[in-house]
From Swiss-Prot:
Role summary: RNA-binding protein involved in modulation of mRNA transcription by Polymerase II. Component of the tRNA-splicing ligase complex.
Gene: rtraf
Keyword Glycosyltransferase: no
Quaternary structure (record): Homodimer. Component of a tRNA-splicing ligase complex.
GO biological process, one term: positive regulation of transcription by RNA polymerase II
Superkingdom of origin organism: Eukaryota
Name this protein carries in UniProt: RNA transcription, translation and transport factor protein
Localization annotation: Nucleus; Cytoplasm, Cytosol; Cytoplasm, Perinuclear region; Cytoplasm, Cytoskeleton, Microtubule organizing center, Centrosome
The family this protein is said to belong to: Belongs to the RTRAF family.
C-alpha cells in the first residue's frame, strides 16, 4: 500500500513494511521524523524515540496534532499514508534543484508500450467495442464477451491470413497441381467408368475439405494457446490478459 512512497523516501524495507507491527510502526515514525519531516527540534524528539514506553501512543497523538494531521491515532493506515505524503513534499522541497534537472524516463515506457499495443486500450470504451465488433463481423470471427480477446483473435487472423506474405502463399496454394485419377484407387467399382471417375473426384474433394478443416483446427489451437500463454491471464478467475 505504501511501497511507492517508501521507495521514494529510500526507506530500508519498502516492500516488507507492516504498520500493524507495533514495534516496527514506532521505529518507522521515529525514522520518518528524524530523517524526513523534522518537525521537532532534535532535543524535543526524546518522547517519540522512547519506543518501549507505555506512554508512546500519547506522545504520538500529540505529534499528529502538532503536524496538523487530519487523522487520529486509531486510523493507522490513513495516518501513515498522510505522513508519507508530507515527508515526500518535504523531501522534494529540500532537493528541488536535484529533481528539477531529472529527465522523465519516457524511452523505456515507449518500448514497453510498443511491445504490446493492446495494454493501454480501454476495453469499456463504446467506440472501441463498436470497432472490434465491426472487424469481427467483417472477418467472420466468433463473438466473445471479452472484447480484448476478440481483438487478439483479429490480430492473429490478420497476421496469418492478410499480410502480404500470407496472401502470396495462399495464392500459390490455390494454383495447385494436376492430379491423375488413375493413381488414386477408388476401392469399389460402380460398373460405369464415368461414375467411377466422378466418385474419385468427390473423394479427392472430400480429402481436400478435411485438410482445410484440420488447418483451421490447428489455427484455432494456436490462437487459444496464444491467449492462454498471456502472463496476465488468470485461469482460476477465467480472466484473460487483465
Amino acid at each position: 500500500m505504501f511501497r511507492r512512497k517508501l521507495t521514494a523516501l529510500e526507506y530500508h524495507n519498502p516492500t516488507g513494511f507492516d504498520c500493524k507491527d507495533e514495534t516496527e510502526f514506532r521505529n518507522f515514525i521515529v525514522w520518518l521524523e528524524d530523517q524526513k519531516i523534522r518537525h521537532y527540534k532534535i532535543e524535543d524528539r526524546g518522547n517519540l524515540r522512547n519506543i518501549p514506553s507505555s506512554d508512546w501512543p500519547k506522545y504520538f497523538e500529540k505529534y499528529l496534532q502538532d503536524v496538523n494531521c487530519p487523522f487520529s491515532v486509531q486510523e493507522r493506515q490513513e495516518t501513515v499514508d498522510w505522513l508519507l505524503g508530507l515527508a515526500v513534499r518535504f523531501e522534494y522541497g529540500d532537493n528541488v534543484e536535484k529533481y528539477r534537472n531529472c529527465k522523465p524516463v519516457t524511452e523505456t515506457n515507449d518500448v514497453q508500450k510498443s511491445a504490446d499495443p493492446l495494454i493501454n486500450l480501454d476495453s469499456n470504451n463504446p467506440d472501441f467495442k463498436a470497432g472490434v465488433l465491426a472487424l469481427a463481423n467483417l472477418l467472420k470471427i466468433q463473438r466473445h464477451d471479452d472484447y480484448l480477446v476478440m481483438l487478439k483473435a483479429i490480430k492473429i487472423l490478420v497476421q496469418e491470413r492478410l499480410t502480404p506474405d500470407a496472401i502470396a502463399k495462399a495464392s500459390q496454394a490455390k494454383e495447385g497441381l494436376p492430379v491423375t485419377l488413375d493413381k488414386h484407387i477408388l476401392g469399389f467399382d460402380t460398373g460405369d467408368a464415368t461414375l467411377n471417375e466422378a466418385a474419385q473426384v468427390l473423394r479427392l474433394l472430400h480429402i481436400e475439405e478435411l485438410r482445410e478443416l484440420q488447418t483451421k483446427i490447428n489455427e484455432a489451437i494456436v490462437a487459444v494457446q496464444a491467449i492462454i500463454a498471456d502472463p496476465k491471464t488468470d485461469h482460476r478467475l477465467g480472466k484473460v490478459g487483465r
